[in-house]
From Swiss-Prot:
Its cofactor is pyridoxal 5'-phosphate. The modification N6-(pyridoxal phosphate)lysine is found at K202. It is an enzyme of class 2 (transferase). It comes from the Bacteria. GO terms for molecular function: pyridoxal phosphate binding; transaminase activity. The gene is parS. It comes from Streptomyces paromomycinus. Keywords: Aminotransferase, Antibiotic biosynthesis, Pyridoxal phosphate, Transferase. This is L-glutamine:2-deoxy-scyllo-inosose aminotransferase. Gene3D superfamilies: Aspartate Aminotransferase, domain 1, Type I PLP-dependent aspartate aminotransferase-like (Major domain). GO terms for biological process: antibiotic biosynthetic process; polysaccharide biosynthetic process. The keyword Ligase does not apply. Belongs to the DegT/DnrJ/EryC1 family. L-glutamine:2-deoxy-scyllo-inosose/scyllo-inosose aminotransferase subfamily. CDD domains: AHBA_syn. Catalyzes the PLP-dependent transamination of 2-deoxy-scyllo-inosose (2-DOI) to form 2-deoxy-scyllo-inosamine (2-DOIA) using L-glutamine as the amino donor. Also catalyzes the transamination of 3-amino-2,3-dideoxy-scyllo-inosose (keto-2-DOIA) into 2-deoxystreptamine (2-DOS).
Length: 424
């Protein structure tokens, strides 16, 4: 093998293609064709004598997660906002969120006129640190949002106990954890409600989409109203050609519904989710061993995790190695070796260029409010260290075979051994 790195003009470890994502389920095309000719393309379309695809997916996803209620929504972002609004969160309320996550963890709180309070994470799981949450609570705290990040499930025993002790709703952001379990219970079913994203990159995808799940019938009814312009599904059968949404006037909402095309696709993709998750899990276990041999520290999950899933495979750089460069430079080198993106983990939301409340006039609600939502007021040392020293691989690579995992490990080892050549 050449001593020079591919990023500097050397030969890469691999030139063969990697698995593509998304991968359509066997019945996906047939399901989409069925919607196309059904005469109903949305939940607000007329009843045609059969259950809507939206209802079919809602029932299937609720059953899959072991809960009574699922309300599909337009996106993971919409789902988070719906869940927060269903909790009654609004102007001036504080919501605890992790500092290490996609920017939606903060922007959704702003979107309901509340104040995101960013907390540090556990250095091994990269999920919300219960001790940091405890320290951040104030009389204005109205909810805690926990994100199951990358491939880890958060410390739900401690977080649930904390939320219960303070009488706070606990919301699970499961956008990256479809199918994961904690003490035998699916994530999303462990707290007040769980929210999901079905965006293009997710392990269960319809391109865009989301869902809120809960065991609470009244909570689900509020979510239904909030996502369908104040309307909810009829509690009894309607006649052919009639709309299934009823205008109750109970709660004003907006349109955050999925289309019948998205719902039909999700019904089919749900059928292959467990099989795909198992393949990722098997390959990730091999990769854990291979990368540990090279000195990397793969992300761990909380004690109590009974089924782990992988949206992203994350690993910390070897101790004492590559200290002269950041994870972005290492990711660029690994990308050149492997031919697919290897990226640093999320930047802390507080300094993410995509999170800037000052850029939106809607958040200019006075000096006091603007001071409270200023992300610069938070210090997140664990988030900062993770961003500097952690690289990530998208789950599509984990749908390969064992030889693919060996290629990944070879590239990771090569970059460590020749890391002195890197700059940046």
């Amino acid at each position: 093998m050449t001593r020079s790195l591919a990023v500097q003009g050397g030969s890469p470890v691999r030139t063969r293609p990697w698995p593509l994502w998304p991968q359509p389920a066997p019945g996906a095309v047939r399901a989409l064709d069925g919607v196309l000719t059904s005469g109903r393309w949305s939940i607000s379309g007329p009843y045609r004598g059969a259950a809507s695809q939206e209802r079919r997916f809602a029932q299937a996803f609720a059953a899959y997660n072991g809960v009574e209620h699922c309300v599909p929504a337009a996106s993971g972002t919409a789902s988070l906002m719906l869940a927060m609004e269903a909790c009654g969160i609004g102007a001036g309320d504080e919501v605890i969120v992790p500092g290490l996550s996609w920017v939606a963890s903060g922007s959704t709180v702003l979107g309901v006129n509340a104040v995101p309070v960013f907390c540090d994470v556990d250095p091994d799981t990269l999920c919300l640190d219960p001790a940091a949450v405890e320290s951040a609570l104030t009389e204005r705290t109205k909810a805690i949002v926990v994100v199951h990040l990358y491939s880890a499930v958060a410390a739900m025993d401690a977080l649930r106990a904390l939320a219960d002790r303070h009488g706070l709703p606990l919301l699970e952001d499961c956008a990256q954890a479809h199918g994961a379990e904690y003490r035998g219970v699916k994530v999303g079913a462990l707290a007040t409600a769980g929210t999901f994203s079905m965006q293009h990159s997710k392990v269960l995808t319809s391109g865009e989409g989301g869902a809120v799940i809960t065991r609470d019938a009244e909570f689900a009814r509020r979510v239904e109203h909030l996502r369908a312009d104040g309307r909810c599904l009829a509690g009894q059968p309607v006649g052919d050609g009639q709309m299934e949404l009823v205008e109750t006037g109970e709660l004003m909402g907006s349109n955050r519904c999925v289309s019948e095309f998205q719902a039909a696709l999700l019904v089919e993709q749900l059928g292959v989710l467990d099989e795909q998750n198992e393949r990722r899990r098997r390959n990730a276990a091999l990769l854990d061993k291979l990368l540990a041999d090279e000195g990397y520290r793969p992300q761990t999950t909380s004690e109590g995790t009974s089924t782990r899933t992988y949206y992203t495979y994350a690993a910390r750089l070897p101790e004492g190695e590559l200290t002269h460069v950041d994870a972005a430079a290492v990711g660029e080198a690994l990308t050149a070796e492997l031919g697919f993106p290897v990226a640093p983990c999320y930047a802390p939301i507080t300094r993410n260029r995509l999170y800037d409340p000052r850029s939106r006039g809607r958040f200019a609600l006075g000096v006091q409010h603007e001071s409270r939502i200023d992300p610069k007021r938070f210090e997140l040392p664990v988030c900062e260290e993770a961003a500097r020293r952690t690289v990530t691989v998208h789950h599509a690579a984990l749908l390969g075979d064992e030889s693919d995992m060996h290629d990944i490990a070879t590239a990771f080892g090569k970059v460590v051994r020749h890391g002195a050549l890197l700059t940046g």
